[in-house]
């Protein structure tokens, strides 16, 4: 996915989350292990959200065990940098053909 397409998908994802009552805390957070697309909060829980989009395939398949491991390490790095210890989870926002699917607390 090009940077422009990725940025557009992340913008759509952030607006989608806001419509669901999430507060966007940060976007495109870079850690030594990788990037977190969106960091949002709802009900005292931090959500580290990976955004994937695609028209000709299932974007969820791009979240591999290695990618999930890097997201978790990046989330832990974020929490350590901010010196906070809230409950958190890793979510996926899938954009496909104009539709948005939100998958909370992904595991592989």
Curated annotation (Swiss-Prot):
Transmembrane segments: none annotated. InterPro entries: Restrct_endonuc-II-like (IPR011335), tRNA_endonuc-like_dom_sf (IPR011856), UPF0102_YraN-like (IPR003509). GO terms for molecular function: nucleic acid binding. Belongs to the UPF0102 family. This is UPF0102 protein WS0451.
């Amino acid at each position: 996915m090009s940077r422009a397409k990725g940025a557009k998908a992340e913008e759509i994802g952030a607006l989608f989350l806001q419509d669901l009552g999430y507060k966007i805390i940060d976007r495109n957070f870079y850690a030594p292990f990788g990037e977190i697309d969106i960091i949002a909060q709802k009900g005292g829980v931090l959500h580290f959200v990976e955004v994937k989009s695609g028209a000709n395939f299932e974007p969820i398949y791009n979240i591999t065990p290695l990618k999930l491991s890097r997201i978790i390490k990046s989330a832990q790095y974020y929490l350590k940098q901010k010196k906070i210890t809230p409950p958190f989870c890793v979510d996926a926002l899938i954009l496909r053909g104009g539709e948005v699917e939100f998958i909370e607390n992904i595991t592989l």
